[in-house]
Amino acid sequence: MVVGTSCQPQHGLYLLLLLLALPLRSQANAGCYGIPGMPGLPGTPGKDGHDGLQGPKGEPGIPAIPGTQGPKGQKGEPGMPGHRGKNGPMGTSGSPGDPGPRGPPGEPGEEGRYKQKHQSVFTVTRQTAQYPAANGLVKFNSAITNPQGDYNTNTGKFTCKVPGLYYFVHHTSQTANLCVQLLLNNAKVTSFCDHMSNSKQVSSGGVLLRLQRGDEVWLAVNDYNGMVGTEGSDSVFSGFLLFPD
C-alpha cells in the first residue's frame, strides 16, 4: 500500500469533512497527520450562578473625626400662625385688687314692706331757775319738738295715742340734791337720785315702756328737788315710739 499518494486528498474537501465530522479524526490512519482546523464560533453566554454564602462580619471601621461646626444660618421667614390650643387648667386665685373708684348713685329701691304709719316723738325743756315743788310733778314748759302734741306743756304729762313700745329719757341739771322719778299712771317706775358734790351737776336716766292708748307718763321729784333749767344748765325730757303694736 502506497501511503504517499492516498493520504493527500484535495485540501477543500478535506477541510469540509473535518468541520462536519471531527470525531472521525480518531479513526484516521495513525500514520497520517491532518491540518489543524479553524477556531470554532464563540458560544452563547452562560446563566448566572447561585448566590454564594454570606461572608463573615468585617472588622469595625476607624471612628470618624467630628467635623467643625459650620457658620450660623440666616433667620428664616416667620411661619404661619398656629391653631389655638386647648384651654389650660384654672390657675389659683390672685390676691384682691385695689378698690375701684366709687360708682354713681344707684336707682331708688322699691318701697319696703314695713312702713310706720303711726309716729310719736317729743323733746321738751324746763327753762326756769326755780326748783319744782317738792314731792310734785315737774313741768317742762318749752317744746323743742312735739309734732303730734303728745306731750302737754301745760299739764307736764305725755299721753299715749299709739299703743306700742316707747323709750323715755331725761337729762337734768341741778344745783342741789335731786331725785327724779318717772311715773306711769301714778305708779313710780324709776327713780334716779344724785347728791351734790359740786356747784352744778347733771343727772340722767332712761327706760323702755309698753304703753296702751290713754296711758300717761311724767316726771316728778321728792323732797330732793334741786332741778334747774338755765342757759348752760338745761333740763330735758324726751320720748319716742320704737315699735307700734
Curated annotation (Swiss-Prot):
Residues in Collagen-like domain copies: 31-112
Q: Which residues form the signal peptide?
A: 1-28
At which residues is glycosylation annotated? 75
Example GO biological process: negative regulation of macrophage differentiation
PROSITE patterns from the xrefs? C1Q
Residue numbers bearing the 4-hydroxyproline modification:
36, 39, 42, 45, 63, 81, 96, 99, 105
Q: List the disulfide bonds.
A: 179-193
What is known about its processing and modification?
Answer: O-linked glycans consist of Glc-Gal disaccharides bound to the oxygen atom of post-translationally added hydroxyl groups.
- C1q domain boundaries: 115-245
Where in or outside the cell it occurs: the entry states:
Secreted; Cell surface
Give the regulation of activity.
Answer: The C1Q subcomplex is inhibited by sulfated molecules, such as triterpenoid sulfates, heparan sulfate, or chondroitin sulfates.
Tell me the segments the record calls region Disordered: 42-119
5-hydroxylysine modification, residue list = 75
Domain remarks in the Swiss-Prot or TrEMBL record: The C1q domain is the ligand-recognition domain, which specifically recognizes and binds the Fc regions of IgG or IgM immunoglobulins. The collagen-like domain interacts with C1R and C1S proenzymes.
Protein name per Swiss-Prot or TrEMBL: Complement C1q subcomponent subunit C
Name of the gene: C1qc
